[in-house]
Amino acid sequence: MGSSDSSSGSAPPRHQPPPPQQGSAPELPPGFRFHPTDEELVVHYLKKKAAKVPLPVTIIAEVDLYKFDPWELPEKATFGEQEWYFFSPRDRKYPNGARPNRAATSGYWKATGTDKPILASGCGREKVGVKXALVFYRGKPPKGLKTNWIMHEYRLTDASSSAATSRPPPVTGGSRAASLRLDDWVLCRIYKKINKAAAADQQRSMECEDSVEDAVTAYPPYATACMTGEGAHGSNYASLLHHQDSHEDNFLDGLLTAEDAGLSAGATSLSHLAAAARGSPAPTKQFLAPSSSTQFNWLDASTVGILPHARNFPGFNRSRNVGNMSLSSTADMAGAGTCAVDNGGGNAMNVMPPFMNHLPVQDGTYHQQHVILGAPLAPEATGAAASAFQHPVQISGVNWNP
């Protein structure tokens, strides 16, 4: 009865959370990362693991690292994205030695540099652990191929640990595995080193791909034109060729039309010139000054002056024989814009030149014929132009001296 009263009067037992299950992944709040310092790894995880004290959180898996290759370890980790943490035992390479066995499945781990001490952050700054860096090599030593896989190995350095690991245990009736055990637990961090040059090349490649995609997005008509051409003509280039052919046809049609218009305008201008010359001869002598603003109109009656008198140059023969034809610079122009050409048989035929600057006839003695066109010449340039070798032309029926 009393026991029941005492039991009833005692406080109810507090509810304690169950210990975390081994191997279950922890649930961290968003934004939290497991990135402990070297001291935290040794003091709060490795020390407690060696003393068999419950850990704050089950976030580090127990794996024998030397039975796997490093690229197989990420899938065996409990937690991690770019780096992975493991508790692993460490064995001796020889039964009577203190050298650890670093052999793995398809390679080996090789230590780089010397061990670095891990100091506590308290006032005493005591040494709590040792950190060693190792690199994984493919193949067999000493001709292994170096890889980018790195391991940081953390070990304890307290008196009991150093005494236990400095000398091999006595060989008794136990198993051989127990005799080779160097450390029950070491904490290892595994990660793959990123090559900066390769990362830069990959970044540039991604930027180039993005720029190409942006260019295609910015200019969709070209892609649409190619797709349309492929469906209509059966080829990606059919639409472009069709567009080019139509452009050339339009260009040639416009050129021929402009040339025909220029010839018609030239013939009409010659008619107006002859009529104006017969009706009211100009009192002065001027050079040809066609309109520069009208395209393809070489002779405009409103802007063309009257041809000057024929001038005689010493030693210059106006009549020359070219082949079977005799060209005379004093040929009569019967009608508007016609010139007489003697073909050697005495029969003269009227020819309508398309332009006033007809093709010159050259010989070995005199320079090429020049026709002065454009704006009115300055007085100082008139003398130089008159002294050049030119074929003067006379128009019959025109009274030059009123």
Swiss-Prot record:
Keyword Transcription regulation (UniProt): yes
InterPro entries the UniProt entry points to: NAC-dom, NAC_dom_sf
Keyword Transcription regulation: yes
One annotated GO molecular function: DNA binding
Domain notes per entry: The NAC domain includes a DNA-binding domain and a dimerization domain.
Known DNA-binding region: 128-199
NAC domain boundaries: 28-193
More details: High grain protein content (GPC) is a desirable trait in breadmaking and pasta wheat varieties because of its positive effects on quality and nutritional value while Low GPC is a desirable trait for barley malt and beer production.
Single GO BP term: system development
UniProt subcellular location: Nucleus
Amino acid composition bias (Low complexity), ranges on this chain: 1-13
UniProt-annotated stretches for the region Disordered: 1-33
Record's protein name: NAC transcription factor NAM-2
Organism this protein belongs to: Hordeum vulgare subsp. vulgare
GO cellular component labels: nucleus
Keywords linked to the UniProt accession: DNA-binding, Nucleus, Transcription, Transcription regulation
Origin: domain of life: Eukaryota
Function of the molecule: Transcription factor of the NAC family associated with the grain protein content (GPC). Accelerates senescence and increases nutrient remobilization from leaves to developing grains. Sequences of 11 European varieties of H.vulgare tested belongs to the same haplotype while the sequence found in H.spontaneum, an ancestor of the cultivated H.vulgare which has a higher GPC, belongs to an other haplotype.
